[in-house]
Amino acid sequence: MSILFKIFASTLAVVSVVNAGELLNFENERDIIRGSYIVVMKDGTSSSDLKSHMNWAANVHHGNLAKQGPSRSIGFQFSFDIGGWRGYSGKFDNDTLNAIVNNAHVKYVEPDRMASATVLKIQKNAPSWGLGRISHTFRGFKNYLYHSSAGEGVLAYVVDTGIDINHPEFEGRAEWGINVVDEVDTDEHGHGTHVAGTIGSKTFGVAKKVKLVAVKALGKDSRGPDSGIIAAMDWAVKHAKERGILGKAIMNLSLTGDTATALNEAAERAVEEGLFLGVAAGNNNRDAINESPASVETVCTAGASAENDEKASFSNFGSLRTSMAAPHVCGVAALLMSSEGIKAQEACDRIKKLARPAIRNPGNSTTNKLLYNKSGF
């Protein structure tokens, strides 16, 4: 969880300045990337203000490096502008960081850290009981029933380890979008391809006509920095806007980490801009309010259930939306957006309204509702 930063080693002096930003930190420092930071500007900062600020920060950084000699501090990595939520990330020395924190245009600075894909237990060539379950009001059915529109006209951004876009299960409906984590434009892990398959493959997909876009933000170890995930969301919002499909686009985030202010705010803005966000609650068997971006109120957070309609033993819990995994939720969102013509911003409420009270022993303050695709059975 992000808290106000009080002590930053012994080398950084935090100076009190009127209207200065705040330096945040995580209670659990396990996944922090040392020396890397996300800088978020104050509300109302224009794009030209951001550009001027970054020019100023670059000059400060270069000046400090010149005084200190060779350094690993490399400066800027990404810049963000999601519906007016603006900022940037980079690696900075302590003197530069101190100057940035105390700049009047800065809202806060948060250490960058590594987020991880939620673990998937994959049984190869196994029948998907989940498809049968979400299309029936009672368990025990194996057939999958769904509206014939099958998500046609909806675009799904899969922010993950990439997608094997040439896999025959995707029937040419998958395309490569952007890679913000490494130089390898393919899925070296398999997590992203599995997630994409659950959303929209011809055999195991919930929405079998949805188009899929690979947005690679996690590497072959299924981990990636928050800054890259934010950059991926920023790219997806702009891409959807350029294609004129805001309101008809969804984003799956089957990844998690401790609560992070910047990542949560970026997710909020992506929803405000017109994307449906389906997010994994996490696999740590704890309240999802402690996870990002699962703790964001406006995203559709999904926990996992078992075949007997009980909460899966590994799934997180809390007062956060329907059960079943995030890719299933994204698939149902695509179905409803295609068949009913609803907008992305309406899809989560529609999903919650359709969901059935079927989950047994869901956990503290947790919904007992199970995902349902409105098949009529």
UniProtKB/Swiss-Prot annotation:
Signal peptide residue numbers: 1-20
GO terms for biological process, alphabetical: proteolysis
Gene Ontology terms: cellular component: extracellular region
UniProt domain Inhibitor I9: residue ranges: 36-114
Residues at the active site: D160, H191, S323
Name of the protein in question: Subtilisin-like protease CPC735_012930
The keyword Zinc appears for this protein: no
Family assignment from sequence similarity: Belongs to the peptidase S8 family.
Main EC class the enzyme belongs to: hydrolase
PANTHER family for the chain: CEREVISIN-RELATED, PEPTIDASE S8
SUPFAM superfamilies: Protease propeptides/inhibitors, Subtilisin-like
Keywords: Glycoprotein, Hydrolase, Protease, Secreted, Serine protease, Signal, Virulence, Zymogen
Domain Peptidase S8, residue spans: 128-377
Species name: Coccidioides posadasii (strain C735)
Sites where a glycan is attached: N252, N364, N373
Protein purpose: Secreted subtilisin-like serine protease with keratinolytic activity that contributes to pathogenicity.
Record-level Gene Ontology MF annotations: serine-type endopeptidase activity
